[in-house]
Amino acid sequence: MFLNKLIKNKYKQNFFSFKNYCTINNNKPLNGFKILDLSRVLAGPYATQIFGDLGAQVIKVENVGKGDDTRQYGPPFYVDEQGRKGSAYFSCANRNKKSIALDISTKEGQDIVYSLAKESDVFIENFKVGGLKKYSLDYETIKQINPSIIYCSITGFGQDGEYSKLPGYDFSVQAMGGLISITGDKENPYKCGVAIVDMMTGLYANIAIQAALHHREKSKDKKGQYIDVSLLDVQASFLANHGSSYLVTGETSERVGNSHPSISPYDSLKTKDGFMVVAIGNNTQFQSMCNVLGLPHLSTNPLFSTNPSRVLNRKQLLSILTNETLKFNTDDIVKLLGDSNVPCSPINSIDKVVNHKQIKHRNMIWNLPLNENNNNNLNNNNLNNNNSNNNLNNNNNNNKNIQNDKGEYIMNSINLIGNPIHFSETNIHTPSSIKSNIPPPFLGQHTDEILKNIGLNENQILNLKNNNIVQ
């Protein structure tokens, strides 16, 4: 078969074209690395999106038909001018990737993965333990094709142990890993507002892969390795002071709402028109807060003069402070306290965050045309700091709020929250660098391009499509 012939010929062609991948700026720190992404949902895709943001080439392998599960997560959904459909959920972790849709249960589909893996630096997946072995896409098989590859598996509970075969989801691991037990008020445990375990697992996976790449570059034989990352391990690792406190005392932490078990006042406080938070870290900050609120005597009161005493008398202290903060509008009291170097902030809704002047100043909202060919024509005003105070609804996407009869948002470009890393020498937040990003791909958007880059002609690609092997 023609794909087997490609493998025997040792894949003389590169699996992906540098020229086609990045339209403007290829001076990003991970430029040159090639990532083959068979993961889906959030943890794996978040890890590979970071690679893409930093300049690596990422190919996302998806199922024929439905693709990544998160393509169905919604509403909200959006469509571009060509009627191609995307989901807001999918878009949060899948920019800077190119999508190929193929059936890995077929020999032809597996051969395509082999040809891509041959030229890849990294292979990442989050199937159940052993899930890819039945498709001959497990580490032992892939490393025979490419001994230098870094192969990362993300699972709920790791590759071994009695829980290893169980499916793992962020919500269940937040519960099993103790996070929900310390989140919420005394009566009601709550999950985090975002899938924090998935996100942290993606970060750990990315760190682990970069460490393995560094080790490979230093080693004489340039040998790759296998990486096993699990959601439960990650959740346990960031129990932080709650975990260490138990290991010291043998006592578990109680839920204290927005309070801190060891610091006070470190809490949310009501204001005249909403809520604010204060995060007092030392006695000097507490004294400053008391002075602003007209309570200078409070900082010398033995009940509140030290942090341990404030923790013991937390309820009484918060009642006194709230009586004063209720006299102010949120913005006013936050400014007064901030001017006195008291750590505090309003509790912002999402719209206030993405339109915040500091977020805009830092170029943290990236506007990407859904048609990649329009990258060079992207209006710099969307990216220029001079316009950072403009509201997103009026600035980046005039069609943002228009919906069709299916409730889908009609969009020519998409706003995304950008990568938070700021480099001095390889700045990924300049207008030209932001313009070089590619939007979250539609399912199979780059199938033809990728297959042509591994040597297939149009007739061969059409044959694969007719047999539902690729899309």
Curated annotation (Swiss-Prot):
The active site is at D198. CoA binds at K128. Residues 376-404 are annotated as: Disordered. Residues 376-401 have a biased composition (Low complexity). Keywords: Transferase. It comes from the Eukaryota. InterPro entries: CoA-transferase_III_domain, CoA-Trfase_fam_III, CoA-Trfase_III_dom3_sf, CoA-Trfase_III_dom_1_sf. GO terms for molecular function: CoA-transferase activity. Its EC number is 2.-.-.-. Pfam families: CoA_transf_3. Belongs to the CoA-transferase III family. This is CaiB/baiF CoA-transferase family protein DDB_G0269880. It comes from Dictyostelium discoideum (Social amoeba).
